[in-house]
């Protein structure tokens, strides 16, 4: 699997191969296109096609040399309609100076000069030839070279340089874009030599779920050591089991702080008699009229 068609200076290190394998860049799909057969390593028993990692590294270095040959970095346009590649293309553009189109590609961006999103790049790089087919189609109209991350079942029509890799996983997409950016910076001289490690981690290119990021932010903002005392403490800000702080109204006795059942009389009848005293019904006190009709 080691690349044999490269100069010795471009040979992959053991760390590079281990990273490609750890990110599952070698795991393809169960379908295999005719144009992707030269990049096939073998087919597993479950029908999954395995990509040759050596071929992947060869195409990464080839694509990096093509990108570095363009004088103006902004003449390179990186595109990703797939969500897993949008963060990667934005980081690639930030590190290399390219233009990024993350999300939906506006039709006519390469062909209709009246639109505000019109661009004239000298090279485009797409994450998936199937999801970014509109960009590849328009590039073919205006003779723009295309570099694409291709899986075993990806269409390669109008694709000039295909980088064989798993273009459906978040880790594999991010790692290939990270390696591509690192090789471009090495060729431009931004990274002094090949022995100098790049201070940017591959994790920066990986897709992150916005909901997971929001949950992590909430967890970080929580004050450690603060314990809640129940729903009353949460709603009012006061402890649930404290003493009575409210003064009794004028003319009424203060409420007892003990159990309410202790203050109740033994029976209802005795309590009612003690509370009301002698009967004060108006029917009993009114004089009776004895005169008849």
UniProtKB/Swiss-Prot annotation:
Biased composition (Low complexity): 247-256
Compartments, record wording: Cytoplasm
Main location: cytoplasm
GO biological process: ribosomal small subunit assembly; translation
Region (Disordered): 239-293
Pfam families named among the record's database cross-references: Ribosomal_S2 (PF00318)
Gene Ontology MF terms in the entry: structural constituent of ribosome
Xref: CDD domains: RPS2
Residue runs in coiled coils: none
Family: Belongs to the universal ribosomal protein uS2 family.
Function according to Swiss-Prot or TrEMBL: Required for the assembly and/or stability of the 40S ribosomal subunit. Required for the processing of the 20S rRNA-precursor to mature 18S rRNA in a late step of the maturation of 40S ribosomal subunits.
Protein name in the entry: Small ribosomal subunit protein uS2
Organism: Chaetomium globosum (strain ATCC 6205 / CBS 148.51 / DSM 1962 / NBRC 6347 / NRRL 1970)
């Amino acid at each position: 699997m080691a690349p044999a068609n490269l100069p010795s200076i471009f040979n992959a290190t053991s760390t590079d191969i281990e990273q490609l394998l750890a990110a599952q860049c070698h795991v393809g799909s169960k379908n295999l296109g005719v144009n992707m057969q030269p990049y096939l390593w073998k087919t597993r028993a479950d029908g999954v096609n395995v990509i040759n990692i050596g071929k992947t590294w060869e195409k990464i270095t080839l694509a990096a040399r093509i990108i570095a040959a363009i004088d103006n970095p902004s003449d390179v346009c990186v595109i990703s309609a797939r969500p897993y590649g949008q963060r990667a293309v934005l980081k690639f553009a930030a590190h290399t100076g390219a233009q990024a189109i993350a999300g939906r590609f506006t039709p006519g961006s390469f062909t209709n000069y009246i639109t505000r999103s019109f661009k004239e790049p000298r090279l485009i790089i797409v994450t998936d030839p199937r999801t970014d087919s509109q960009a590849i189609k328009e590039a073919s109209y205006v003779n723009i070279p295309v570099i694409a991350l291709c899986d075993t079942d990806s269409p390669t029509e109008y694709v000039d340089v295909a980088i064989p890799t798993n273009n459906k996983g978040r880790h594999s997409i991010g790692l290939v874009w990270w390696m591509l950016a690192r090789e471009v910076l090495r060729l431009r001289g931004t990274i002094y030599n090949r022995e100098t490690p790049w201070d940017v981690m591959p994790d920066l290119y990986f897709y992150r779920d916005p909901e997971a990021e929001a949950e992590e932010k909430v967890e970080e903002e929580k004050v450690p050591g603060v314990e809640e005392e129940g729903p009353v403490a949460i709603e009012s800000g006061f402890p649930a089991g404290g003493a009575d702080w409210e003064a009794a109204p004028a003319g009424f006795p203060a409420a007892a702080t003990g159990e309410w059942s202790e203050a109740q009389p033994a029976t209802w009848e005795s309590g009612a008699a003690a509370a009301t005293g002698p009967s004060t019904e108006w029917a009993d006190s009114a004089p009776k009229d004895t005169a008849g009709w």
